[in-house]
Amino acid sequence: MPLFRNAQFEISIAKPSGLPPPNGAEIAFAGRSNAGKSSAINTLAGHVRLAYVSKTPGRTQLINFFRLNCGALLVDLPGYGYAAVPEKIRRQWQGLIETYLRTRESLIGLVLMMDSRHPMTDLDRQMIDWFAPSGKPIHVLLTKSDKLSRGPANATLLAVRAELTARYGDQVSVQLFSSLKKTGVEEVEKVVAGWLVPAAAEGEAPAGA
């Protein structure tokens, strides 16, 4: 069965003190508010409304946890960079996301969504800089790749990969992804599955996972 298929919503938290005790390896999904994060999660899960909970009023500020069949957790972080959000709320989001990324021991990797037409914004770089010191892997999905023709899409992939490799080496990997065309699904599943193998060996995954 595909890794993310049949994911089930488990819990939402609004502040670091609300984080549940570690109970399985966690894979964080992050991205700008318009980067197609919810669509990517829904496509990977094969569920058109799995990430809908994070779109409902009052939920957009939350970290949402979804349990996978393998026992690991998909962790949907609040979208960042939405201009209409009051500054106070943006600071709260920033504190919540930064604390989670920097301190969560059960977090084994970050999947970061960037719009392939506008990748590597200042906020994208900040997100990577928050997480990179952990030494844990980062996988970048260049979303909405169907909006670009093959030549520009591949050029963007090569440019982003070159920039990130120059700075972070093999800690960061990059791929094209399209929720509309469902392209890139197997690649991201393979990458994340590779993260889960050492995590299970170290006891991060629940017994029987």
Curated annotation (Swiss-Prot):
Designated name of the protein: Probable GTP-binding protein EngB
Pfam family of the protein (one): MMR_HSR1
Role of this protein: Necessary for normal cell division and for the maintenance of normal septation.
GO cellular component, as recorded: cytosol
InterPro entries in alphabetical order: G_ENGB_dom, GTP-bd, GTP-bd_ribosome_bio_YsxC, P-loop_NTPase
PROSITE patterns named in the record: G_ENGB
CDD domains for this protein: YihA_EngB
PANTHER family in the cross-refs: ENGB-TYPE G DOMAIN-CONTAINING PROTEIN, MSS1/TRME-RELATED GTP-BINDING PROTEIN
NCBIfam families referenced in this protein's UniProt entry, alphabetically: GTPase_YsxC
Chain's gene name: engB
Keyword annotations of the record: Cell cycle, Cell division, GTP-binding, Magnesium, Metal-binding, Nucleotide-binding, Septation
Protein family according to the UniProt entry: Belongs to the TRAFAC class TrmE-Era-EngA-EngB-Septin-like GTPase superfamily. EngB GTPase family.
Cofactors demanded by this protein: Mg(2+)
GO biological process terms on file: division septum assembly
Stretches assigned to the EngB-type G domain: 23-198
Binding site for GTP: 31-38, 58-62, 76-79, 143-146, 177-179
Superkingdom of the source species: Bacteria
Annotated residues for binding of Mg(2+): 38, 60
Molecular function terms from GO: GTP binding; metal ion binding
